[in-house]
């Protein structure tokens, strides 16, 4: 695999190869909050953690074992909660790993795992857990999980070490991906935060899920009833939705969600204010030749930049493209490269 540093214009510079030493296909790679560590996971059932120095992975990786099937995804918690990593697998389990110091960590069976310890195990799903995501840090240590059993589970970690679990059906034919909304949304377009209504700035628990039913669904937490309720169902795709990503909206008006599908399209769902409806528009990878919204192959992953103004799209043909919204021109591809 490679690391691709980006310059300010959203152009990718030369790739930095990473020899992961995985023995099978790599499914995910995630940098931590500071960009100092890289976690990867693979069908070889392992997780590997590298130190990143000046944009390059250095030294031998820490290898975390315990899953009994392919590991689909890893997710770093905010550093305010410690050095914590979550992983999910085809084996139907979610593991929470914590760095506890060299020589102190013990995994299942008591083996040392290079200073990392598996501190929690979530086993309530009955099929593959395909996606995991930590909530914005100001909501607390909360992890959401999406599974092929059609359910979503939300794990809230308590101060006494216990976990409060809320699990509910989300997509009848399987949930493939999950992404949290910013906890404080820019609710009034063009109005500064100091002028926003006070109740609009309260932290809000909300996320979006993608399913094998070709739909994406938006869920919000009802504080009075203490349960998750469906707020919106958004149609548009004609096949499984493989991934979904809610854009950070730091300094940006409105809300954006990107979804990627087996139907070879990427849709941008936008909502300028809470009083308006969601609208959807496809990316057009064939411009200027045509208005065809189809990529060459199924689209597997979408990911926003930290500022929420650049979208990365990973296609099954092995290429990654970067997209920005032009002024009055829709979304434009500003860079692409082979992975």
Curated annotation (Swiss-Prot):
Keywords: Cytoplasmic vesicle, Endoplasmic reticulum, ER-Golgi transport, Membrane, mRNA transport, Nuclear pore complex, Nucleus, Protein transport, Repeat, Translocation, Transport, WD repeat. It comes from the Eukaryota. WD repeats lie at residues 21-60, 66-107, 124-165, 170-229, 236-279, 294-333. Its main location: membrane. It is a peripheral membrane protein. It is found in: Cytoplasmic vesicle, COPII-coated vesicle membrane; Endoplasmic reticulum membrane; Nucleus, Nuclear pore complex. GO terms for cellular component: COPII vesicle coat; endoplasmic reticulum membrane; nuclear pore outer ring. GO terms for molecular function: structural molecule activity. The keyword Transmembrane helix does not apply. One of its GO terms (biological process) is COPII-coated vesicle budding. SUPFAM superfamilies: WD40 repeat-like (SSF50978). The COPII coat is composed of at least 5 proteins: the SEC23/24 complex, the SEC13/31 complex, and the protein SAR1. Component of the nuclear pore complex (NPC). NPC constitutes the exclusive means of nucleocytoplasmic transport. NPCs allow the passive diffusion of ions and small molecules and the active, nuclear transport receptor-mediated bidirectional transport of macromolecules such as proteins, RNAs, ribonucleoparticles (RNPs), and ribosomal subunits across the nuclear envelope. Due to its 8-fold rotational symmetry, all subunits are present with 8 copies or multiples thereof. Component of the coat protein complex II (COPII) which promotes the formation of transport vesicles from the endoplasmic reticulum (ER). The coat has two main functions, the physical deformation of the endoplasmic reticulum membrane into vesicles and the selection of cargo molecules. It also functions as a component of the nuclear pore complex (NPC). NPC components, collectively referred to as nucleoporins (NUPs), can play the role of both NPC structural components and of docking or interaction partners for transiently associated nuclear transport factors. Belongs to the WD repeat SEC13 family. This is Protein transport protein SEC13. It comes from Cryptococcus neoformans var. neoformans serotype D (strain B-3501A). The gene is SEC13.
């Amino acid at each position: 695999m490679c690391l691709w540093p980006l310059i300010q214009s959203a152009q990718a510079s030369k790739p930095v190869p990473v020899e992961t030493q995985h023995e099978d296909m790599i499914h995910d790679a995630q940098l931590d909050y500071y960009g100092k560590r890289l976690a990867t996971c693979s069908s070889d059932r392992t997780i590997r953690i590298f130190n990143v120095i000046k944009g390059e992975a250095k030294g031998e990786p820490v290898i975390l074992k315990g899953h009994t099937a392919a590991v689909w995804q890893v997710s770093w918690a905010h550093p305010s909660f410690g050095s914590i990593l979550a992983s999910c697998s085809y084996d139907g389990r979610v593991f929470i790993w914590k760095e506890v110091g060299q020589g102190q960590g013990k995994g299942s069976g008591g083996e040392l795992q290079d200073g990392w310890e598996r501190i929690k195990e979530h086993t309530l799903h009955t099929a593959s857990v395909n996606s995991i995501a930590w909530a914005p840090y100001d909501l607390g240590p909360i992890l959401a999980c999406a599974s092929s059993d059609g359910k979503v589970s939300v794990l809230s970690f308590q101060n006494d070490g216990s976990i409060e679990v809320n699990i509910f059906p989300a997509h009848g034919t399987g949930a493939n991906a999950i992404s949290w909304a910013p906890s404080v949304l820019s609710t009034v377009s063009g109005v500064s935060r100091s002028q926003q209504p006070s109740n609009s700035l309260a932290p809000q628990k909300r996320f979006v899920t993608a399913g094998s039913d070709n739909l994406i669904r938006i869920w919000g937490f009802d504080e009075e009833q203490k349960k998750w309720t469906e707020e919106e169902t958004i149609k548009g795709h004609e096949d499984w939705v493989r991934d979904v990503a809610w854009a950070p909206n730091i300094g940006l008006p409105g809300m954006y969600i990107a979804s990627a599908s087996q139907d070879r399209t990427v849709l941008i769902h936008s909502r300028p204010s809470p009083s308006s409806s969601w609208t959807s528009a496809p990316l057009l990878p064939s411009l200027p030749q045509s208005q065809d919204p189809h990529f060459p192959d199924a689209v597997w992953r979408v990911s926003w930049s930290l500022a929420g103004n650049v979208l990365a799209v990973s296609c099954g043909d092995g290429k990654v493209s970067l997209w920005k919204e032009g002024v009055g021109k829709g979304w434009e591809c500003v860079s692409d490269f082979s992975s």
